[in-house]
Amino acid sequence: AVTDNEIVPQCLANGSKCYSHDVCCTKRCHNYAKKCVT
C-alpha cells in the first residue's frame, strides 16, 4: 500500500532547521540561520 507520505512530500514549516530550499514549504532556506523562511 502507498502511504500519504509517499504521495505528498513532507515540507518543513517556517523556523524549522533546513539545509536546502527544497525541504521547506516556502522553498526558502536561510543560508546562515539554517531555518526555513518566508
From Swiss-Prot:
Example of a GO cellular component annotation carried by this entry: extracellular region
Coiled-coil ranges per UniProt: none
PTM per Swiss-Prot/TrEMBL: Contains L-DOPA (3',4'-dihydroxyphenylalanine).
Lineage: superkingdom: Eukaryota
Modification sites for 3',4'-dihydroxyphenylalanine: Y32
Keyword field contains Secreted: yes
Subcellular location: Secreted
Assembly behavior: Monomer.
Function, as annotated: Potent reversible, competitive inhibitor of tyrosinase (phenol oxidase) in the nanomolar range.
Comment on protein domains: The presence of a 'disulfide through disulfide knot' structurally defines this protein as a knottin.
Name of the molecule in the record: Tyrosinase inhibitor
Taxonomic path: Eukaryota, Metazoa, Ecdysozoa, Arthropoda, Hexapoda
